[in-house]
């Protein structure tokens, strides 16, 4: 069977702060530049016909950062959602969020929900932002939901595949395909509590390029390498 581009790309956007430091600028400037690349990479994936793109924007661990930086990131996110809405509408891009947004302030939550609603029928590409997201937290929340619906008697009658299907149906990503390709910029070689369940069979790509410097040519090279890899999913050729 002829190899094809991934259906679902996930990106750990790492290196904004280090990029800013190298430029002699504040970390906040690095985040601003990173937001521009979010727009670009979404457009590049749409041009390639890739249906789903998930971007790790703010993790459950990022609250440990200095309050001034966290506050800036929240304001930057709200501004991004407002400023980019015409782009989503014009390019028929659907916007979705995974993660626990209940802790965000009302204005930010409303901006997220408004853009999700406005773009819910768009079909060109679905862009998913992972916000206040951690894979362990997601799985724990899923188990809590299931615990309210399953009795010991019901559980005893289920096969492991039944349980896997139930978990899939209750994750934040319930209606999304598994991740085929996971990219991390910034040089680190770990996946940092990101989509541990969904990326079980993903092809991993690590680059030393800091996220604000990540470009179309590098993405294209990764996509070409993806086409060359043999994905056997535990089987044989």
UniProtKB/Swiss-Prot annotation:
The active site is at residues 14, 62. This is Isoprenyl transferase. Homodimer. Catalyzes the condensation of isopentenyl diphosphate (IPP) with allylic pyrophosphates generating different type of terpenoids. It comes from the Bacteria. Substrate binds at residues 15-19, 27, 31, 59-61, 63, 65, 184, 190-192. The lineage of its organism: Bacteria, Pseudomonadati, Campylobacterota, Epsilonproteobacteria, Campylobacterales. Its EC number is 2.5.1.-. Mg(2+) binds at residues 14, 203. One of its GO terms (cellular component) is cytosol. GO terms for biological process: polyprenol biosynthetic process. Keywords: Magnesium, Metal-binding, Transferase. Its cofactor is Mg(2+). InterPro entries: UPP_synth-like, UPP_synth-like_CS, UPP_synth-like_sf. Binds 2 magnesium ions per subunit. GO terms for molecular function: ditrans,polycis-undecaprenyl-diphosphate synthase [(2E,6E)-farnesyl-diphosphate specific] activity; magnesium ion binding. Belongs to the UPP synthase family.
């Amino acid at each position: 069977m002829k190899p094809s581009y991934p259906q679902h790309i996930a990106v750990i956007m790492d290196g904004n702060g280090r990029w800013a430091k190298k430029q002699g600028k504040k970390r906040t400037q690095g985040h601003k530049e990173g937001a521009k690349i979010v727009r670009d990479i979404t457009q590049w994936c749409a041009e390639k016909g890739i249906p789903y793109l998930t971007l790790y924007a703010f993790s459950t661990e990022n609250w440990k950062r200095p309050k001034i930086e966290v506050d800036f990131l929240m304001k930057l996110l709200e501004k991004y959602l407002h400023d980019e809405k015409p782009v989503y509408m014009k390019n028929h891009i659907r916007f979705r969020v995974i993660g626990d947004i209940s802790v965000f302030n009302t204005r930010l939550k409303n901006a997220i929900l408004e853009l999700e609603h406005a773009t819910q029928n768009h079909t060109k590409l679905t862009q998913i932002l992972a916000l206040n997201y951690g894979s362990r937290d997601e799985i724990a929340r899923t188990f809590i939901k299931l615990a309210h619906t399953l009795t010991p008697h019901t559980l005893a009658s289920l096969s492991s595949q039944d349980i896997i299907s139930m978990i899939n149906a209750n994750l934040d990503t319930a209606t999304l395909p598994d991740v085929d390709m996971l990219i991390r910029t910034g040089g680190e070689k770990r996946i940092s509590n990101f989509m541990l369940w969904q990326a079980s069979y993903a092809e991993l790509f690590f680059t030393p390029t800091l996220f604000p410097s990540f470009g179309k040519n590098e993405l294209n090279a990764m996509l070409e390498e993806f086409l060359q890899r043999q994905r056997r999913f535990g089987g044989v050729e």
